[in-house]
């Protein structure tokens, strides 16, 4: 078996993913040190570097699939080349194979966030945003004068194979993050949004300061699957207890939309795992006045 890093049309849900039907998906938020390009000659290609970051998926594939991919990608010619690379996930670093642009690949346009799915999103007219932290709550959104951008709420949504963390540190405590965990799920609120809402979110999440990065995830809401924009911490640290005002935003925003099971998880989170002073009383009061 071979570990394979894919970043373009071979990713789950894209045009060539069926060529990996017999593979095992190990990680959807894997990364390598490289620069991602798109060109007229092909959908996407990477050049290995020591500065950039490209995000994609890590698969485990059989030798027969690799033989087929070699033929398809023209690895023996000059279109794509098979290379060895170190892949980083939220839990480990490992060696893998990646197909990079060959020497004769024409110069393309570098993609700023190193994420093929993000560059192509949305492929249709509808754009969705999955909030799992403080953006489930509208208080700060109202104060910013952008409430109209978040009025179209699809409903509660669930992100499978991730867990909630507080790995971004600021002066008064931790801030919410998601991390891949095949035994867990994260619930939140799914909004239908427009580009001005995305601009607000990029600023609020500190994308340009390098705090969070945008990514595309698959969520379930009311029995339907959606591809949605969300944000995850780039430099994850150990979990840190969030402050009361932030924990309150999360619970208040989640309360009308998430399942009873997840509500109970949040209650346990803010009273036992990450005890936040005042949250036990606040959550009881919110329950009484619902």
Listing of model-derived features with the role each one plays in the protein:
Residues 1-290:
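Glycine-aromatic micro-motifs
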